[in-house]
Amino acid sequence: MQVILLERVAKLGQMGEVVDVKPGYARNYLLPQGKALNASEANIAQFEAQKAQLEARNLETRKEAEAMAEKLDGQQFIVIRSASDAGALYGSVTTRDAAEAATADGFSLDRKQVSLSRPIKELGLHTVHVTLHPEVTADIVLNVARSAEEAELQASGKSIQELAAEAEAEAEFEIAELFDDIGSAASEDSDLVETPEDRATEEAEDEQP
């Protein structure tokens, strides 16, 4: 099926090009999204008549996207999720979650603008690709953590493995301190108990003139 592109489409072509695509791709994506028209003679003539207007609109939207990309690129957004001690999520983080996290921080993103090779299923920092315009992209970072405190530590560069090791070491230290306290208390108690040797010493001292 032939269509005429109304904007640049990655791996397909530039605005104004007539390209061959699969009918399903055209009907389910290109046509309803307003990215292309059926390449009939009437539509091609209509495009040529409106080409200058379409190019001006594309230039305007690209400038807006570039301005947003400057602010958005490299930004980090926190996503709180439940996870196991090993860092595996109970569920996953999707394109919708990424868009909602960015939007909550003041950036208007749609899930269709977010690209994930696969759903995120573990804690940590994850770089996510965002398409703001056919010619403008940005990368954001999702900080997936179990709490705001954990997210802050991850942002400082600590991995979930390092955080788990620190928590384990702290727990072992607290247990060791507890046993030390118990040992000290037991030693103090033993000093208060009178032994046969203590009584014999006291009796010998009493018998002395």
Curated annotation (Swiss-Prot):
Gene Ontology MF: a single term: structural constituent of ribosome
Domain of life assignment: Bacteria
Pfam families per UniProt: Ribosomal_L9_C, Ribosomal_L9_N
Example of a GO cellular component annotation carried by this entry: ribosome
Keyword Ribosomal protein tagged: yes
Region (Disordered): 184-209
Claim: tRNA processing is one of the keywords in the record: no
A biological-process GO annotation: translation
Keyword entries, A-Z: Ribonucleoprotein, Ribosomal protein, RNA-binding, rRNA-binding
Job of this protein: Binds to the 23S rRNA.
Family the UniProt entry places it in: Belongs to the bacterial ribosomal protein bL9 family.
NCBIfam families: L9
Record protein name field: Large ribosomal subunit protein bL9
Upper classification of the organism: Bacteria, Pseudomonadati, Pseudomonadota, Alphaproteobacteria, Rhodobacterales
Gene: rplI
